[in-house]
């Protein structure tokens, strides 16, 4: 199954958080916080403005993005947990 987001929505896959502290202690899944970084897998056409024009998306497929802890709606697709969120929920793009 493939998901194509509409309008100003994006599909993001969370990046795995570091499961080990600097001193070597392994953090169990139940104790760790959900990562707030992800990779954009798909983007919609853009936000429809009040005048009917479409503002293009600022993010693109492959971008590494930062988002809030509670951003987006979680969906399962072929065993993967993905987030569907509005572009405005993205706080920034991580540049290498």
UniProtKB/Swiss-Prot annotation:
Keyword ATP-binding: no
Example of a GO biological process term: chaperone cofactor-dependent protein refolding
Gene giving rise to this polypeptide: groES
Cellular localization per UniProt: Cytoplasm
Annotated keywords: Chaperone, Cytoplasm
Entry superkingdom: Bacteria
The UniProt record lists the keyword Cytoplasm: yes
Biological function: Together with the chaperonin GroEL, plays an essential role in assisting protein folding. The GroEL-GroES system forms a nano-cage that allows encapsulation of the non-native substrate proteins and provides a physical environment optimized to promote and accelerate protein folding. GroES binds to the apical surface of the GroEL ring, thereby capping the opening of the GroEL channel.
NCBIfam families: PRK00364.1-2, PRK00364.1-5, PRK00364.2-2, PRK00364.2-4, PRK00364.2-5
Similarity section: Belongs to the GroES chaperonin family.
Pfam families: Cpn10
A GO CC term assigned to this protein in UniProt: cytoplasm
A molecular function GO annotation: protein-folding chaperone binding
Name of protein: Co-chaperonin GroES
Organism: Aromatoleum aromaticum (strain DSM 19018 / LMG 30748 / EbN1)
Main location: cytoplasm
Subunit structure: Heptamer of 7 subunits arranged in a ring. Interacts with the chaperonin GroEL.
